[in-house]
């Protein structure tokens, strides 16, 4: 993408994120977004198919950023969870707006799929404990759904809880499955 398009895309995403913090998704129009971003309608539609497409891309960007690979070791669950929480915390304004608004379902689904993918890479194929008696698909879904619930709880409480404590609490809820 050329620099001009990237600048317009960034302005649209920033404007949309601001609007999501101010009002419900269903009340936001493409007109509101382009007015806030200072771009034309043709520019918007050259980059996004619709407001829903913009929402999906925003959510995807946040989910992708959450799992950015910075060399964090995948063999230490605490380090891995803290890394993801730190990346979500960096985008907490957008996450809070998505969790609280009409985009919450899209955000939850995207994050669940992203975490399931990561869990599939890190959870042993034949885990110990009760997890070993579960179907793999169910186990991965449970781990990811619990993670999404934790992120929602954290956002609903304005990210006030310490990331390390949230990570420890999440793992305390999940680890008994593997003992």
Predicted regions and their residues:
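Basic/polar phosphate-binding segments, predominantly the helix-turn-helix DNA-binding elements
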Residues: 2-5, 33-55, 87-90, 94-98, ...
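An amphipathic alpha-helix adjacent to DNA-recognition modules
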Residues: 6-17, 21, 26-38, 45-71, ...
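Amphipathic alpha-helical packing segments from all-alpha helical-bundle domains
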Residues: 83, 104-148, 179
């Amino acid at each position: 993408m050329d620099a001009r398009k990237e600048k317009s895309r960034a302005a649209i995403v920033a404007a949309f994120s601001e609007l999501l913090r101010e009002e419900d998704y269903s009340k936001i129009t493409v007109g509101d977004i382009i007015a806030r971003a200072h771009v034309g309608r043709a520019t918007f539609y050259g980059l996004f198919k619709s407001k829903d497409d913009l929402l999906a891309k925003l959510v995807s960007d946040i989910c992708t950023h959450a799992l950015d690979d910075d060399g964090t070791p995948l063999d230490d669950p605490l380090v891995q969870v803290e890394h993801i929480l730190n990346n979500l915390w960096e985008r907490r304004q957008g996450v809070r707006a998505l969790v609280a608004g009409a985009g919450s379902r899209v955000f939850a689904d995207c994050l669940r799929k992203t975490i399931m993918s990561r869990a599939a890479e890190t959870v042993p194929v034949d885990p110990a404990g009760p997890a070993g008696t579960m179907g793999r698909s169910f186990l991965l879904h449970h781990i990811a759904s619990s993670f999404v619930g934790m992120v929602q709880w954290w956002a609903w409480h304005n990210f006030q809880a310490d990331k390390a404590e949230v990570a420890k609490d999440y793992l305390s809820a999940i680890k008994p499955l593997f003992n």
